[in-house]
Amino acid sequence: LILGFKYAEQRHYPCVQGRTFFYPKIGRLAVKVLTREEQTKLEQILYQELSPINIGVLIALYGGLRIGELCALRWADFDGQNGTLKIDKTLLRIQNTVREIPEKTKILIGEPKTESSNRLIPLSSFLTELLREYQKEDGDYILTGTPDYLEPRICLEKYKKILHRAGLSSFTFHSLRHTFATRCVESGFDIKSLSEILGHANVNTTLQRYVHPTMERKKQQMDRLEKISIWGQNKGRRHS
């Protein structure tokens, strides 16, 4: 409902003009991030058969896309020469307000939710090479390999089946985006670049919502303190 009102405001629908809406604050649930071992299990299943949906999951895992952005991707958005993905659309199912049409909901393909979400994502070399190998016609959707789209609900169902085959617990599709951000930080990404790749308006969003240090990462950071401790300094002398 909140998304519906916000969409109507952005599109300047007459029914909401001049009205003030107070949205309830909703506590954010922590998003689970795949460990490196879990990510390996998932990728092993994906590489067994590089179907369109499996390729899509890899794009989300190594590009940080939202599910609506992924569903809206066509092969025309992939630049194989420069190794980039253009994100300028999102696909979602919304409430149908036309009374003459019996369906309660309809599919909308439109602009991403914010201006910063319109972006050009540089892909890693391995993903660029993989996409080149499986590239279809420009008008085809990446998730289907045909001119027909795959809506988020069906995409999610297929994703859950992949997780089941990998023997993993229930991770949301958004977990892939958070896992991407976490791996980037672990690999030494600068936050500004990561923020722009994720389509965030500022780095604070990236830091507050998408950086999930693993216990291994925390341990590595804590071990740095040994260098400044008397024990650590004496340890260095003992081994010299």
Regions picked out by a protein language model, each given a short descriptive name:
Residues 33, 91, 128, 198-224:
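Catalytic-site neighborhood detector that most strongly recognizes the C-terminal catalytic loop/helix
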Residues 77-84, 170, 189-209, 234:
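Short, polar N-cap/turn motifs at the start of nucleic acid-interacting alpha helices
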Residues 11-16, 24-45, 53, 96-124:
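DNA breakage-rejoining catalytic core of tyrosine-based enzymes
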Residues 1-20, 66-68:
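N-terminal DNA-binding recognition helix of tyrosine site-specific recombinases/integrases
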Residues 8-17, 80, 91-98, 131-139, ...:
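Proline-centered turn/helix-capping motifs that create local helix->coil transitions or kinks
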Residues 90, 100, 122-169:
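Active-site/catalytic core of tyrosine-dependent DNA strand-transfer enzymes
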Residues 82, 91-118, 125, 145-146, ...:
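C-terminal secondary-structure termini that scaffold catalytic or DNA-interacting sites
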Residues 10, 58, 62, 68-69, ...:
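C-terminal catalytic core of tyrosine-transesterase DNA break-rejoin enzymes
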